[in-house]
Amino acid sequence: MAVFVFILTFFFMEGVAWFTHKYVMHGLLWNLHEDHHTHTNPGFFERNDAFFLIFAVPGILCTVLGSSLGFLALFAIGLGITAYGFCYFLVHDVFIHQRFKWLRKTDNVYFRAIRRAHKKHHKHLSKEDGECFGMLLVPYKYLKAEIEASRK
């Protein structure tokens, strides 16, 4: 049962990330997210990095409370949130934005589609008119474009 809860939580987090990105990061908390689009911060860290902590808190709380209370489902939820956060970090910060110079030379169609969709998202420098707010699920048109490009 705990494995099912973990997997369900992991995939549910894609919806949470999409919703939060579209309505919170590009809404009420745009002041934290804006420098991620405009690259106005000259240093390594961005105000946008605060979202790492904001998203980490529920994962940590669920993991610690689930573990200390012996509530396995809550522990699994915490691990699912944390696993999604780790994947988000690898895909978004490492693979897409190359904040760390790992995973640079992949030729995988799916990963290229993720990169293409995110690039489209970053074409919008304001909080309005955005698109592609998710991370791991990309609109089919980007996957299709990469499949067609790989056949050439």
What does each model-identified segment do?
Residues 56-63:
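Hydrophobic, membrane-inserted alpha-helices
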Residues 2, 12, 27-51, 65-74, ...:
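Cytosolic/stromal cytosol-facing helical appendages immediately following the last transmembrane segment
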Residues 1-20:
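N-terminal signal-anchor transmembrane alpha helix
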